[in-house]
Regions:
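Terminal transmembrane helix and immediately flanking juxtamembrane interfaces
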Residues: 56-58
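Sequence-level detector for tyrosine residue identity
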Residues: 19, 28, 39, 72, ...
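Alpha-helical protein-protein interaction scaffolds
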Residues: 1-54
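Non-heme Fe(II)/2-oxoglutarate
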Residues: 60-152
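Charged, low-complexity, helix/coiled-coil-prone segments
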Residues: 25-37, 62-83, 166, 173-176
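Structured loops at beta-to-helix junctions and adjacent beta-edge loops in soluble globular domains
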Residues: 47, 74-81, 89, 93, ...
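Catalytic core of non-heme Fe(II) oxygenases with the double-stranded beta-helix
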Residues: 124-134, 138-220
Length: 220
């Protein structure tokens, strides 16, 4: 019984169960009643965004009701005149880092993933990459600083990066997921397969969750 657990994850799973049962009024009631309790619960924030998009009715959860409007793109070209050489140097350093094939309890399928935070005692090129990410975080905030959602209004003053690297092989992919312990998530593609106009290797952003889904949910 999810209600008896009373923790960050169980409250979201209870909402997903209510959605499966079609109890929409109860969903809104719970999200609104717990809006102050869950103001930084990204599991609930993600579900709230989902239900708002489907039902076209806002909740009192103000973390970020329209997350697809906060997608931000950049390019290493804007940080390095010779970005190709920089990428190759980063890749060479990443090759020295231990990885596991399809690690358990992770979202990597048919691929390798590193086992620890790359930005803890980083090598030179990875440290340079870390500096680029920090500058991009500042650019991200500058772009959205006038928005009233909690994602921006409660923007952390201290930057603490956690990262890992993934190498996907043939037919490899990342299953749908969020990073509930991170204020903001991102990905840097260092090497990609040719697109062939079929979106091979492309990331998809959606409001659907691991255990809740609607065919008309917006995606990018």
């Amino acid at each position: 019984d999810f209600d008896s657990c009373k923790n960050l994850i169980s409250r979201t799973r209870a909402l997903a169960s209510l959605y499966a049962l079609g109890r929409i009024d109860e969903i809104y009631k719970r999200i609104n009643e717990d809006s102050k309790l869950d103001y930084e619960n990204l599991h609930v924030a993600a579900f709230s965004s989902f239900i708002v998009a489907i039902k076209k009715k806002n909740t009192l959860n103000k973390f970020c009701n329209e997350p697809l409007n906060f997608i931000y793109f950049s390019n290493l070209l804007s940080h390095h005149d010779d970005s190709g050489s920089f990428i190759n140097e980063v890749v060479d350093e990443l090759k020295k880092i231990k990885t596991n094939w399809e690690p358990s309890n992770k979202t990597t399928h048919k691929g390798f993933q590193s086992t620890f935070n790359l930005f803890k005692n980083p090598s030179q090129k990875i440290s340079n990459l870390q500096s680029i990410i920090i500058r991009e975080l500042d650019s991200y905030y500058s772009k959205f600083k006038n928005d009233s959602c909690s994602l921006i209004k409660r923007w952390p003053l201290k930057k603490n990066l956690e990262g890992w690297h993934v190498v996907l092989k043939q037919q490899g992919f990342q299953s749908a997921h969020i990073h509930p312990k991170g204020w903001l998530s991102g990905v840097i593609y260092l090497k990609v397969v040719p697109s062939l106009n079929k979106n091979e290797g492309a990331i998809e952003f959606s409001l659907n969750g691991f255990n809740y889904f609607h065919i008309n949910t917006p995606k990018k």
